[in-house]
Amino acid sequence: MKALIIEDETAAALNLKAILKQAAPDIRVVDTLESVEESIGWLRANPQPDLLFMDIHLADGDSFRIFDAVEIAAPVIFTTAYDQYALEAFKVNSIDYLLKPLNACLLYT
């Protein structure tokens, strides 16, 4: 399974990669992106991954803007420190909403 990580905090992205390697070794992270604009460009230029892990607050805006620019068919797991966006997240392809800091136990459930 191919996954894309959209996360502007380097430490959080590295933590998520480590958790995925431990909890779901069959998931291969194809890229890690840090901004809305970079993500839009990547999604337009590449085949969609099987799964997206997406932070909501990115340096250049909120990641919901990506859905306005690109049709995303893959399921999305939002990873954020803010719980107030849960309803908005489930209006798009969200299958889960994980609050930071992440740990491996969250991915097992």
Per-region residue spans from a language model:
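Conserved acidic carboxylate
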Residues: E7
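Charged phosphotransfer/docking patches of two-component systems
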Residues: T10-L14, A86
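Charged docking surfaces used in two-component/phosphorelay signaling
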Residues: L14-A18, Q22
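Alpha-helix termination/capping residues and helix-transition junctions
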Residues: A24, A45-N46, K91
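A generic structural motif
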Residues: A24-V30
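CheY-like receiver
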Residues: P49-L107
